[in-house]
Design a protein with these regions (language model features):
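Conserved short beta-strand edge segments in small beta-sheet-based binding/regulatory domains
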Residues: 257-273
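Short, hydrophobic/proline-enriched secondary-structure or compact coil segments at domain edges
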Residues: 39-45, 172-174, 230-239
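Short acidic, S/G/P-rich loop/turn micro-motifs used as interaction or catalytic elements
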Residues: 48-49, 179-182, 238-244
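Short, intrinsically disordered low-complexity segments
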Residues: 70-115, 119-120, 126, 196-253, ...
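Short amphipathic alpha-helices in soluble, non-transmembrane regions
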Residues: 185-192, 245-260
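Surface-exposed beta-loop interaction hotspot
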Residues: 118-205
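Ordered, small/hydrophobic-rich secondary-structure cores
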Residues: 2-3, 24, 28-115
């Protein structure tokens, strides 16, 4: 079976989603930098064999612009294949923008995708008989088919002017596919010290949190989007101009994304509204 046929078979397999154990201690965003730079997922096996090994793993990374917005998404997967050469693991790395898109758009496939840590991906890779998971520099060499995003100008969400005492105001949205459980909401509320939103009559904003870093004020809303997705809307009110601003924003966006992945959601894109 060649890699192209194998991608189709992996995509069509029946859903089976075991409960993920990816539950590290929550941390306040901005207080530490996540260690791995890539996002990892386990593809679970078919429903007919729930106790068997995972079907494969996925490594992904957003392509980011200077301001932290996503212009594309790179990904590669390792899955089992029939007919591998003697002595080699019966699997291979492959890259497919179509599969990357389907992980987010197809509910059946999404039900078989579990967000995991780098450590758990390493364990799954060994369980698949593939040996030690390559380092992230090597994994990036397997990214051959980028999923491109629309490069249109930012939308406007809220007033464009910075509040008094700040020189710039930016609004970002991290969009996620998947369902957030009640337990997940409790975990996020505790980790982010969120307060309930009392000024959203439509009930779309579940909670709000904020943090101050080096004179910059960051606040974010956890929001339901259309009843089918979730987002974290980050507002950055920037104090004195600094060459470090871009790095601080990208780090915070990364930490917010990681926290949502811990609760089983899959990041779709990072947009800027102002």
């Amino acid at each position: 079976m060649d890699a192209e046929t194998h991608r189709s078979e992996t995509y069509r397999s029946e859903p089976n989603l075991p409960e993920t154990t990816y539950r590290p201690e929550p941390a306040r965003p901005g207080m530490r930098t996540p260690e791995p730079e890539l996002d990892y997922y386990v593809i679970t096996g078919e429903a007919a064999a729930p106790a068997g090994p995972p079907a494969g793993i996925v490594a992904e990374e957003f392509v980011l612009s200077d301001d932290g917005t996503a212009t594309g998404l790179n990904g590669a997967a390792w899955t089992r294949m029939d007919g591998a050469a003697g002595g080699a693991p019966d699997g291979a790395w492959w890259s497919s923008a179509e599969f990357t898109r389907a992980m987010r758009a197809d509910p059946e496939l999404r039900g078989r995708i579990v967000a995991v840590s780098r450590h758990e991906a390493e364990a799954a890779y060994r369980r698949l008989g593939a040996g030690e998971l390559p380092g992230e520099a090597t994994l990036r060499t397997y990214f051959h088919d980028t999923l491109p995003f629309d490069g249109s100008a930012p939308l406007r969400l809220g007033p464009p002017d910075a509040p008094e005492g700040f020189h710039d105001r930016r609004v970002y949205r991290i969009l996620f596919a998947g369902d957030l459980s009640e337990t997940g909401l409790v975990n996020l509320s505790a980790g982010w010290r969120m307060r309930a939103a009392d000024d959203d009559a439509r009930g779309r904003v579940v909670g709000t949190a904020h943090i101050t870093l080096a004179g910059d004020l960051f606040s974010w809303d956890l929001r339901r989007v259309g009843g089918m997705a979730w987002s974290v809307d980050l507002t950055a009110c920037l104090g004195e101009p600094s060459p470090r601003t871009g790095g601080v924003i990208r780090r915070l966006l990364r930490e917010l994304t990681t926290a949502m992945r811990r609760e089983g959601l899959i990041p779709v894109t990072i947009e800027r509204f102002s």
